[in-house]
Amino acid sequence: MSETPNLATEAVLVHSAPVPEDAVPVSGIDFDKPENKNTRAADLVGAMNGMGFQATSLGQACNIIDEMRTWEGVDKEGNPAKTTIFLGYTSNLISSGLRSTLKYLVKNKMVSAIVSSAGGIEEDLIKCLAETYLGDFALKGSVLRETGMNRIGNLLVPNDNYCKFEEWVVPILDTMLEEQEKQGVSWTPSTVIDRLGKEIDNEDSVLYWAHKNQIPVFCPALTDGSLGDMLFFHTFKASPLQLKIDIVADIRKINSMSMAATRAGMIILGGGLVKHHIANACLMRNGADYAVYINTGQEFDGSDAGARPDEAISWGKIKAGAKHVKVYADATLVFPLVVAATFAKE
């Protein structure tokens, strides 16, 4: 047989439909070109936009955040309004060096509210008292336990850090209990966090700047970590009195913020509680206008972390016409680049 069989050529050499005029060709970054030398972060991300895969998603995330942070309009009363930006992050990101990037956003009043898990609260405070160190993912747990070293991925936290945290936080809890009993102060997770941010008085702290700039920090699972351990110990120390923390007041507070927003945006690093708490608050206004997810979760197991923005649209947590993207990546790898290309570029 000297000619290619028609069956094969008809299967392989199928003609395409005409390419739409607005189709975007794949492109990359040629560092031989003078304009790509000493590239700024915004230019780098802009060039990555055409690469495909997660590079394109990263570019979309930056475009959405830029629109989110720069939008200006008027509220129902005709007053100037900007996007209410909800920032969510998991505790491991505060344990990592990404804490400095998050602090930058809060210090410069670039977000409106924060949701984190308990570790995201306590680790910020503990880092003001003692260092966290680089380690290795492969370090053996039993050996680390014998030496009093706690592993968070490839980070190491000496257990002495938590002892220092207890010494620092328990007197504050004593004072808060006294204010509850004598002055009738009603504590919520966000007011507890605000008080701790005030007391830490350290400019490296996210919570210090949240207190200073009156940015509420919500943590519906405040007891799920070392701070919960300290609260547990305090119930015995203070018995028969007990510090009471009202979570219902905080759900009203964050939901009310969402409902009052002229536009609402979500920037969520990681998944689980922090992701859903913000999304559910946005449900109260029939969905967010912007959403950027950055995490590595997959949706095949039905997990909240793995769910794409489209699932939140089905629940009314993101508006059907909203601008949204999910970037499948470790936030420590890409979020500094996102911030450099958006919030920090001016």
Curated annotation (Swiss-Prot):
Domain of life the protein comes from: Eukaryota
Keywords of this entry: Hypusine biosynthesis, NAD, Transferase
Active site feature: K317
Binding locations of NAD(+): 91-95, 117-119, 123, 224, 271, 296-297, 330-331
Known pathway: Protein modification; eIF5A hypusination
Annotated GO MF terms: deoxyhypusine synthase activity
Enzyme Commission code(s) on record: 2.5.1.46
InterPro entries tied to this protein: Deoxyhypusine_synthase, Deoxyhypusine_synthase_sf, DHS-like_NAD/FAD-binding_dom
UniProt KW NAD keyword: yes
Binding site for spermidine: E122, E123, D229, H276, G302, S303, D304, E311, A312, I313, S314, W315, G316, K317
Gene3D superfamilies: Deoxyhypusine synthase
GO term, biological process aspect, one: spermidine metabolic process
Pfam short name (any one): DS
Catalytic activities: [eIF5A protein]-L-lysine + spermidine = [eIF5A protein]-deoxyhypusine + propane-1,3-diamine
Cofactor requirement: NAD(+)
GO annotations of cellular component type: cytoplasm
Alphabetical list of PANTHER family matching this protein: DEOXYHYPUSINE SYNTHASE (PTHR11703:SF0)
Role description: Catalyzes the NAD-dependent oxidative cleavage of spermidine and the subsequent transfer of the butylamine moiety of spermidine to the epsilon-amino group of a specific lysine residue of the eIF-5A precursor protein to form the intermediate deoxyhypusine residue.
Similarity remark: Belongs to the deoxyhypusine synthase family.
Protein name: Deoxyhypusine synthase
Organism (species): Yarrowia lipolytica (strain CLIB 122 / E 150) (Yeast)
